């Protein structure tokens, strides 16, 4: 308190604590983690809450192939805040972390590590290398999660490669197959030529690509309905005009699709006629830079052209004109190039007309002999050569270079293609209505998630669940050697599941089909009993989509359905959806009661983080500089339902906010030195009014914090805590009570200490889910009463109402604080005029009307002076002083009369009344003498 040394300094109760001002979190946090591990904090917490209602937050498994990033940190910390809060709110809230361990990225890294040896390695050997790679990264990522303060059963995480998980996954597959929800068929699927495998919609990302969009004309060869003759158009000079951005698919063309409801025109250019949608004639001519053209005759309904025939542009074959509702007038010519092997709409309409499905592209994206002279060329290279040849042949009407959004593989980030292949599918269409009903039963947070999920389910195709790779759970299907029919029965599923539960899915590659399939199984089609095994594996989304069965139903500490799934917004097409589909298909209900969604982490300018751009921030860097609690505070301070900004400046600002919260706790701890809550707490009737106000402010904090935690709005909790610490405590209550705390030893001091103790105990519990390290450090320094736990996370959250004040009391103190603010303005003016220095040099006269006088007079004058932090306050009825914003109040300030007390620094007329202490006021002299 005093700047200059005084003989009375030692008589003051100045704050004293070993709780450091500088947090030093990077050094302290690891020691706390070691203590938590040593004392088995997580398992003891779950035991502590045994018998309480369960709250199950089911962890979406991150992919086990690298270090965590800020997005992973955001995800895990949100979950940890929820888990800690629920355990403090009267629930038993277990947290079982999981890891997604199969899939292409791990397989590709394993292959890369083998170099030339990969040519000679067996599938079983490759799988063993993949498992080793995944396991190593599970350990790395687990340590990184724990460093963030995340608590959970990291000793027993769920892993999609575990035998018991794989066995349950096989059973889910079997349940769906039994209901007819899984089938094998030829369909166009997303195909990555570089990874040589099919992809699901969830494995697609879109990026901007350049390409040539071309208008190609196909020469009419047959007119069975006599449409051309009817309109006087010569068939040998007539063409259909199509538009495409995928030149490489032209070898697969088997049809041209028109919309039967549209009108089409004959456009004469020179001596030749071109058929295109009437509404698109001008845009086509503009794109092709053709100025001289003529529309001949009346428009013709698209339906009239059905089943006309045309010559392929370069192959010796003919195609058919067909009709489809998917043809629009948004772009192109209204005549759609149709290659059933390379597009879903194309495939469906081709099936309707029994048009051949041609796929002249192999697994690696090279054209086959079906493409004629272009065989062997990769599709992207073939674009140029085909275009050049067609231009030379006069088949190209126009060409426009465009930029457009094109699908890419999320693994290798290269462009992908649509390619019809034999694949395994989940028939979403079969149970789509049931999925809609399940979506309606779920609480979506934010609530737009409901419509987003419904829209995605409505628009999606059947789910391609097979992959042509090695590292994953095998498709448990057998094939008849005689007729080739696939074979899946209850008995085969049971046998495969039992084998996998015992030996893991590697067993599929160890044994021949006859060693796995139960004896007595016969082909339902031909009665034969010799078998081969399927060589595909399941989509990893089927792996993680099976956790509701393999984890929630299998782990005794968990339950189905989960109370919550919580992941990023990309999981609407990923884990949220795959889990929903498999659960509805197998069990008829959603696997979750609620879904909470968070946004992406972006840089300080709102841009995506990329290593190449140098705008990334790594969790390890922030932990090294500031500590994990600052990352946790960043999470809590953010509106994570939208994209969350992160950067060094943001963390620097948050460290300042953290310092203010920490210093509030430090000030209170310093003033609790020597305070024993078991013996020193005073009764409520011995508290001063300002103490009651502080506790009422605490009650408001408890209410607001609970309201935030209950709806997972941690931003609301953070702001409530920050404002309480800075505005209510540091700027007001703690400042006002300094004289009581430092200069007295009686009931008044103990009343302030009692109040502060109650405040810090409650405040520390409130911040515990967020600042898990700092709250425990505070807890360690807090004096304890009987029944308090060693770890703050074992405590119950404070309940609202214990310190609540009525509206009249709150209104009174709102007005008192308003009066104080007006006094501070006048003191600032006096300080500027150099009539006073510190506020304790002032004496304040308050001119009041009756209402304000009664308000202020209800507070003892010494407490009122402390409230204003001045040496003296005088109340005068009537007008005077400087006008203020408080109606009926005028304020005047002057230098206080009397002398300055050497100990408390207040000015008083009774300085020196005690002969032994001539420089002290009467109060301080009596304290020193006591």
Regions found by a protein language model. Name each.
Residues 2-272, 339-344, 349-352, 356-371, ...:
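N-terminal, positively charged nucleic-acid-binding surface of large information/translation enzymes
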Residues 71-83, 90-92, 99-100, 165-168, ...:
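Structured ligand/cofactor/substrate-binding pocket environments in proteins
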Residues 100, 189, 193, 200-207, ...:
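Acidic, turn-prone loop/beta-hairpin segments
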Residues 145, 168, 463, 656-669, ...:
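Core structural elements
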Residues 188, 405, 476, 516-522, ...:
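Short metal-coordination and nucleic-acid-contact micro-motifs, chiefly zinc-binding Cys/His arrays
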Residues 192, 409, 480, 520-526, ...:
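Short cysteine-rich clusters marking metal-coordination/redox-active sites
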Residues 196, 468, 484, 527-528, ...:
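Cys/His-coordinated zinc-binding microdomains
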Residues 321-322, 885-920:
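C-terminal accessory/binding modules appended to enzymatic or scaffolding proteins
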């Amino acid at each position: 308190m005093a700047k200059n040394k005084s003989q009375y300094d030692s008589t003051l109760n100045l704050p004293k604590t070993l709780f450091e001002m500088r947090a030093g979190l990077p050094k302290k946090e690891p020691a706390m983690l070691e203590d938590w591990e040593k004392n088995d904090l997580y398992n003891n917490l779950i035991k502590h809450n045994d018998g309480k209602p369960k709250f199950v937050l089911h962890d979406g498994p991150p992919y086990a192939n690298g270090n965590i990033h800020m997005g992973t940190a955001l995800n895990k910390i949100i979950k940890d805040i929820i888990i800690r809060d629920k355990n403090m709110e009267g629930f038993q809230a277990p947290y079982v972390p999981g890891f997604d361990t199969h899939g292409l990225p791990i397989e590709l890294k394993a292959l890369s590590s083998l170099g030339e040896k990969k040519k000679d390695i067996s599938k079983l050997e490759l799988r063993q290398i993949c498992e080793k790679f995944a396991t190593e990264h599970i350990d790395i990522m687990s340590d990184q999660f724990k460093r963030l303060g995340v608590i959970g059963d990291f000793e027993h995480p769920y892993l999609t490669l575990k035998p018991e998980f794989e066995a349950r996954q096989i059973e889910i597959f079997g349940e769906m197959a039994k209901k007819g929800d899984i089938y094998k068929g030829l369909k166009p699927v997303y195909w990555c030529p570089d990874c040589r495998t099919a992809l699901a919609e969830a494995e697609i990302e879109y990026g901007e690509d350049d390409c040539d969009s071309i208008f190609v004309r196909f020469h009419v060869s047959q007119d069975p309905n006599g449409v051309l003759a009817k309109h006087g158009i010569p068939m040998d000079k007539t063409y259909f005009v199509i538009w495409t951005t995928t030149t490489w698919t032209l070898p697969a063309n088997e049809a041209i699709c028109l919309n039967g409801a549209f009108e089409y025109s004959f456009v004469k250019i020179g001596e030749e006629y071109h058929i295109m949608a009437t509404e698109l004639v001008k845009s086509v001519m503009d794109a092709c830079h053709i100025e001289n053209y003529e529309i001949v005759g009346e428009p013709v309904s698209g339906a009239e052209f059905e089943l006309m025939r045309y010559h392929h542009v370069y192959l010796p074959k003919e195609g058919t004109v067909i009709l489809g509702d998917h043809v629009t007038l948004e772009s192109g010519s209204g005549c759609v190039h149709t290659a059933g092997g390379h597009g879903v709409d194309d495939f469906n309409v081709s099936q309707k007309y029994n048009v051949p499905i041609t796929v002249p592209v192999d697994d690696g994206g090279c054209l086959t002999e079906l493409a004629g002279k272009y065989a062997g060329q990769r599709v992207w290279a073939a674009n140029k050569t085909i275009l050049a040849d067609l231009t030379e042949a006069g088949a190209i009407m126009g060409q426009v270079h465009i930029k457009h959004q094109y699908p890419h593989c999320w693994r290798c980030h290269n462009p992908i293609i649509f390619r019809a292949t034999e694949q395994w599918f989940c028939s979403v269409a079969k149970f789509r209505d049931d999925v809609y009903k399940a979506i309606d039963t779920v609480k979506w947070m934010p609530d737009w998630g409901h419509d987003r999920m419904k829209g995605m389910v409505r628009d999606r195709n059947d789910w391609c669940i097979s992959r042509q790779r090695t590292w994953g759970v095998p498709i448990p299907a057998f094939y008849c050697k005689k007729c080739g029919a696939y074979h899946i029965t209850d008995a085969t599923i049971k046998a495969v599941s039992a084998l996998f539960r015992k030996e893991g899915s590697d067993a599929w590659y160890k044994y021949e089909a006859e060693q796995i399939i139960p004896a007595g199984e016969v082909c339902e089609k031909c009665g034969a009993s010799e078998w081969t095994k399927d060589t595909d594996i399941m989509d990893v989304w089927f792996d993680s989509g099976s956790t509701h069965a393999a984890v929630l139903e299998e782990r005794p500490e968990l339950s189905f359905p989960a109370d919550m799934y919580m992941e990023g917004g990309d999981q609407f097409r990923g884990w949220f959806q795959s889990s929903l589909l498999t659960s509805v298909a197998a069990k008829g209900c959603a696997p979750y009661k609620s879904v909470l969604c968070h946004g992406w982490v972006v840089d300080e300018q709102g841009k995506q983080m990329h290593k190449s751009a140098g705008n990334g921030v790594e969790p390890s860097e922030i932990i090294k500089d500031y500590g994990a609690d600052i990352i946790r505070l960043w999470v809590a301070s953010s509106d994570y339902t939208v994209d969350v900004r992160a950067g060094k400046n943001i963390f620097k600002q948050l460290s300042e906010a953290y310092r203010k919260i920490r210093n509030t706790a430090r000030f209170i701890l310093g003033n609790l030195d020597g305070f024993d809550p078991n013996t020193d707490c005073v009764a409520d009737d011995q508290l001063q009014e300002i103490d009651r106000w502080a506790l009422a402010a605490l009650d408001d904090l408890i209410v607001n914090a609970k309201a935030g935690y209950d709806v997972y709005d941690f931003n609301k909790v953070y702001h409530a805590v920050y404002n309480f610490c800075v505005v209510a405590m540091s700027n007001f209550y703690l400042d006002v009570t300094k004289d009581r705390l430092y200069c007295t030893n009686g009931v008044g001091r103990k009343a302030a200490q009692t109040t502060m103790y109650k405040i810090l105990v409650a405040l520390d519990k409130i911040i515990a889910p967020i600042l898990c390290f700092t709250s425990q450090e505070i807890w360690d320094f807090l004096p304890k009463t009987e029944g308090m736990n060693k770890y703050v996370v074992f405590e119950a959250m404070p309940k609202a109402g214990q310190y609540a004040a009525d509206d009249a009391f709150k209104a009174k103190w709102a007005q008192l604080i308003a009066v104080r603010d007006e006094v501070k303005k006048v003191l600032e003016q006096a300080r500027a005029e150099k009539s006073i220095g510190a506020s304790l040099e002032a004496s304040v006269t308050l001119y009041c009307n009756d209402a304000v006088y009664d308000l202020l007079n209800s507070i003892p004058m010494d407490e009122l002076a402390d409230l204003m932090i001045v040496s003296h306050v005088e109340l005068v009825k009537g007008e005077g002083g400087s006008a203020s914003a408080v109606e009926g109040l005028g304020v005047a300030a002057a230098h206080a009369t009397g002398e300055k007390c050497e100990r408390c620094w207040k000015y008083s007329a009774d300085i020196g009344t005690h002969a032994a202490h001539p420089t002290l006021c009467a109060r301080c002299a009596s304290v020193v003498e006591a």
